[in-house]
């Protein structure tokens, strides 16, 4: 087990429920693939209650549109780390919000939650990608937040950011999301097995876990199927949802075969 930093039932496809006394939360998985976008999968992307977006992959705009979601409706963007498949869509997201907003006279503010240095990195992407087009959006309609925990205003959610085991140069982190009803979702970002995830999983209803590599790859930076199975066995109370998948989708013919996982583990597909 690596040191880091160096159960709720599923309703239909994507409605995550706590116990009967809790409110319903909607989680849309707009993409479930790893950085290689395996056949039938776009880059991993999750949207909570239509307002909280976790990461911004290069294809974020078609992913949102396919789900019938307007980029202007996103209130909060949570960045897990700096890898391109998690951040290179940021200029496109901002471009749409700035120039194709339903009401350009009432363009909305986006709260971006990152680690220190995020403002500089993401602003540079915008300057290189669309010079002269996004300066006002970055200055006037983007709120930058480097706090490690806080309230996601207007959503009913709060968050706690924590370090995970991934490529150190990307400053990798996950997010523990707590709803006002008590429902807890642990989004682990990109990470291999690590103590920070283990400790938080014990008190989480739902765990969104990546499975970025096949079993013949033993990497400290990603989970493989065997490690996902072991994780689920250690935390039988939690609903384990698998994303950032190395394998093809069920209806694709090429790419790595979809691994067999126990029924209690939900191996997600795009659109779930």
Where are each of the predicted segments found?
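Conserved beta-strand hairpin/beta-sheet module of binuclear metal-dependent hydrolase folds
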Residues: 16-67, 171-189, 206
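Active-site-proximal loop/helix segment associated with metal-binding centers of metalloenzymes
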Residues: 36-38, 116, 139-202, 206-213
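Active-site neighborhood of phospho(di)ester-bond hydrolases with catalytic His/Asp-centered motifs
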Residues: 54-57, 75-81, 85, 89, ...
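Active-site metal-binding motif and surrounding structural segment of the metallo-beta-lactamase
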Residues: 59-111, 206
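Metallo-beta-lactamase
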Residues: 106-171, 259-271
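Cap/insert and terminal regions of metallo-dependent hydrolase folds
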Residues: 192-272
